[in-house]
Curated annotation (Swiss-Prot):
Homotetramer. Forms an RuvA(8)-RuvB(12)-Holliday junction (HJ) complex. HJ DNA is sandwiched between 2 RuvA tetramers; dsDNA enters through RuvA and exits via RuvB. An RuvB hexamer assembles on each DNA strand where it exits the tetramer. Each RuvB hexamer is contacted by two RuvA subunits (via domain III) on 2 adjacent RuvB subunits; this complex drives branch migration. In the full resolvosome a probable DNA-RuvA(4)-RuvB(12)-RuvC(2) complex forms which resolves the HJ. Belongs to the RuvA family. This is Holliday junction branch migration complex subunit RuvA. GO terms for biological process: DNA recombination; DNA repair. InterPro entries: DNA_helicase_Holl-junc_RuvA_I (IPR013849), Hlx-hairpin-Hlx_DNA-bd_motif (IPR003583), NA-bd_OB-fold (IPR012340), RuvA (IPR000085), RuvA_2-like (IPR010994), RuvA_C (IPR011114), RuvA_C_sf (IPR036267). Signal peptide: none annotated. GO terms for molecular function: ATP binding; four-way junction DNA binding; four-way junction helicase activity. The RuvA-RuvB-RuvC complex processes Holliday junction (HJ) DNA during genetic recombination and DNA repair, while the RuvA-RuvB complex plays an important role in the rescue of blocked DNA replication forks via replication fork reversal (RFR). RuvA specifically binds to HJ cruciform DNA, conferring on it an open structure. The RuvB hexamer acts as an ATP-dependent pump, pulling dsDNA into and through the RuvAB complex. HJ branch migration allows RuvC to scan DNA until it finds its consensus sequence, where it cleaves and resolves the cruciform DNA. GO terms for cellular component: cytoplasm; Holliday junction helicase complex; Holliday junction resolvase complex. Transmembrane segments: none annotated. Residues 70-148 are annotated as: Domain II. Residues 149-157 are annotated as: Flexible linker. The keyword Membrane does not apply. It comes from Helicobacter hepaticus (strain ATCC 51449 / 3B1).
């Protein structure tokens, strides 16, 4: 089973990438968000190898490879395809429309209208996804809370604010460890200085 690849991107399209790993070229489907992140990495370091997290689906008629830049996106994809009626195509469409963090907020807010904006999802499908994936995000949020010292609500709220701005959770945690608890806005301002 292929769980990750490190190599050179030789072709990058909006929802598809090819990576050369020691002379073997792998093609994979990716979300628009993932290919955008990958393009940013390539633009900043054109000759540096990239690492792509993978999910592999083997069927009678095809071996499919899906690529992700973040573990949370892969976990969300794998959870989505376990829902009856949601295949890889719809899961990638969801992750192309919304980042995992934004998608989690949609689920928490029970915003069926936002979910219906994803190509291939109707009212019934949106309702089913809402019910079936709610527990997944509840567990995910709980594990995030535990890893960011839940006793400190200010830092937790600051972490959520910084995540909504697109910063990665592990980067945020490192910075927040060195900031004294003031107010949420002061923590966010100080963290932004250090993350920039």
């Amino acid at each position: 089973m292929i769980v990750g690849l490190r190599g050179t991107i030789i072709r990058l399209e909006p929802m598809y990438a090819e990576i050369d790993v020691g002379g073997v070229i792998y093609g994979m489907q990716m979300s628009l968000n993932a290919t955008s992140m990958l393009q940013t990495k390539i633009d900043s370091q054109p000759d540096a190898p990239v690492k792509i997290i993978c999910a592999q689906i083997i069927r009678e008629d095809a071996h499919l490879l899906f690529g992700f830049c973040e573990e949370i996106e892969k976990q969300t994809f794998e959870r989505l395809i376990k829902i009856s009626g949601v295949g890889p195509k719809v899961a990638i469409a969801i992750l192309s429309t919304y980042t995992p963090t934004h998608f989690a907020k949609i689920i928490a807010d029970k915003d069926i209208e936002a979910l219906k904006k994803v190509p291939g999802i109707g009212v019934k499908g949106a309702a089913k996804i809402m019910v079936d994936i709610a527990g997944f995000f509840a567990q995910l949020l709980q594990s995030q809370e535990e890893s960011i010292a839940p006793s400190n609500n200010l830092k937790y709220e600051a972490s959520l604010a910084l995540q909504s701005l697109g910063f990665k959770r592990n980067e945020i945690q490192k910075v927040l460890e060195h900031i004294e608890a003031l107010s949420v806005s002061e923590i966010v301002k100080e963290a932004l200085k250090r993350l920039a």
